[in-house]
Structures are given as C-alpha cells and as structure tokens.
C-alpha cells in the first residue's frame, strides 16, 4: 500500500541489463495517483534519467484512460474500473532502456510541484500497486 505522494520501487537491481516490459495494476479510492510519474534511476543516479509525464502517459494512454481499454503491440490497458483500478502493460522492444550498474524503476502515488498536489483536492488516496517487470540482466 503506497501512501499519498510516496515513491515506490517496482524494480531494483544492482546489475547491468535491459528493461524490456512493465506491467502495473493499481487500486485506489480515486484516480489521482495517475498524476504520479514513472521514474528510472540508472546506475547510482540521484535524479531520474527517464521521467514519464504521468502514469497513464507511460502506458501510452491519456486523460485518466477516459477512452477505456485498448490493446496495441507496444502498450495496452487490460482492465479498468473508472476512478478505482486499472492494469496496463508497456513493452520496450522498440525503445529498450539499457542500464549499467543498476536500475531502480519507481512509481509515485500522485505528484506535486511547488507545494501543490496535481489533480486538485482531495489528492491521491492510499493506493495498492502490483507490478511485474521483465528485464534482462547480465
């Protein structure tokens, strides 16, 4: 269970490799968590080298997945209960993410800037995240 604005690691390795696929499911009392960005910290970086513009954007969706489920060879939304839960996938076959000396992939439960929470009140609620990450390591 992630608290509001908590950054949660969904994959963490000290090895080198290649990120290939990410699946994520989330369940909450509102969709404000979708304002949170997916971040990739490569090596020993303190700041992310990859930053999505929101959770649904990372999975190639928009506007809180307002168009419903979709399936493409690269990304898709396989389950949706509006304003409550979703599951989605993203393949990085065409845009692989290589990493050396470690990769920490995170999701943040909501987002803020200059003291303001994106999406307005009430902000993100506690959110249950489940993930599966497929990476090749060497």
Predicted regions and their residues:
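Beta-strand-centric surfaces of beta-sandwich/beta-rich domains
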Residues: 1-138
């Amino acid at each position: 269970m992630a608290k509001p604005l908590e950054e949660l690691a969904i994959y963490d390795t000290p090895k080198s490799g290649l990120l290939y696929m990410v699946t994520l499911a989330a369940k909450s009392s509102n969709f404000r968590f979708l304002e949170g960005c997916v971040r990739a910290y490569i090596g020993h970086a303190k700041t992310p080298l990859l930053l999505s513009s929101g959770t649904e954007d990372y999975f190639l969706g928009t506007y809180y997945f307002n168009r419903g489920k979709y399936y493409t060879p690269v990304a898709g939304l396989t389950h949706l209960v509006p304003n409550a839960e979703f599951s989605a996938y993203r393949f990085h076959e065409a845009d692989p993410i290589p990493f050396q000396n470690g990769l920490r992939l995170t999701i943040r439960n909501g987002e803020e800037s200059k003291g303001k929470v994106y999406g307005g009140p009430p902000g993100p609620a506690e959110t249950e995240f489940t993930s599966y990450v497929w990476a090749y390591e060497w």
